[in-house]
Swiss-Prot record:
GO terms for molecular function: pyruvate synthase activity. InterPro entries: Oxidoreductase_gamma_subunit, PorC_KorC, Pyruvate_synthase_PorC, Pyrv/ketoisovalerate_OxRed_cat, Pyrv_flavodox_OxRed_cen. SUPFAM superfamilies: Pyruvate-ferredoxin oxidoreductase, PFOR, domain III. Its EC number is 1.2.7.1. This is Pyruvate synthase subunit PorC. Keywords: Oxidoreductase. Transmembrane segments: none annotated. The keyword rRNA-binding does not apply. Coiled coil: none annotated. It holds the Pfam family POR. Heterotetramer of one alpha, one beta, one delta and one gamma chain. It catalyses: 2 oxidized [2Fe-2S]-[ferredoxin] + pyruvate + CoA = 2 reduced [2Fe-2S]-[ferredoxin] + acetyl-CoA + CO2 + H(+). Gene3D superfamilies: Pyruvate-ferredoxin oxidoreductase, PFOR, domain III (3.40.920.10).
Amino acid sequence: MPVAKKYFEIRWHGRAGQGAKSASQMLAEAALEAGKYVQAFPEYGAERTGAPMRAFNRIGDEYIRVRSAVENPDVVVVIDETLLSPAIVEGLSEDGILLVNTVKDFEFVRKKTGFNGKICVVDATDIALQEIKRGIPNTPMLGALVRVTGIVPLEAIEKRIEKMFGKKFPQEVIDANKRALRRGYEEVKCSE
């Protein structure tokens, strides 16, 4: 008899330089501050900006013993729509969520991946360009993820942005990232 999973798993797909690793780390730190047990780690080969990469999260109420890559995620986050393929949704059950950074509709994503479960889309790149003035869509994607999962409160991510960016960047950069986070949260749309 299979043992019930005691933690929530997320697999991020993006390209190096798009912030998947940073987003998974920020999510983990926010969950840790909320009293959860967490894991966040990237997986990549010889990295160059633009090379495909993955990052992973596990978040739970109990100690997480497993140390392998996420094989059966509850959510797959795709930061770069050019990576969409059936391989992206490998291990994602029909009860899971596929969250994609795209301007395209649910049917486009469904055709590219063959996934018949819940699909959520948000134009995170445009949000990032408008708010942060850089085409790095990880912050709006994190806002969208928080909205569709409720894994941590949005305010917990805002606090992490303040802590992570507070000593390195001026207040206007922090505020721009918080706006991008909120817009991702507000603008994500889901099928079903």
